[in-house]
Amino acid sequence: CRGEGVYVYDNSNTRFIEGMSGLWCASLGFNNKDLVEAASKQMEKLPFYHSFAGKVPEVAANLAEKLVGIAPEGLDKVFFCNSGSEANDTAIKVVWYYQNAF
């Protein structure tokens, strides 16, 4: 099996349109050469780092600054997650904390 652009291919090399974006984790398609190159470069530097200790990799800090720069006024905090589920879970916890429900 493999993916190419908006298509996936089965073991018989039959091509199908993958209309669900890999369940939302491949919204830019499969095997995008620019994304493969960028991800490969980053994997060589630092593939993952937690933020538990209040430290952040330079690449994440730079991206956060760019996001704040284009966000509407007042949206000046950035929290990186691994998935939409993690983002939603964290957002709910922040609201609970803010409302003193924790």
Residue ranges and their predicted role:
Residues 1-4:
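Short, small/polar residue-rich loop motifs at catalytic or cofactor-binding pockets
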Residues 10-11:
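Short, acidic, Ser/Thr-enriched surface-loop or helix-capping motifs
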Residues 15-102:
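Glycine-rich loop-to-alpha-helix module at the N-terminal edge of alpha/beta enzyme cores
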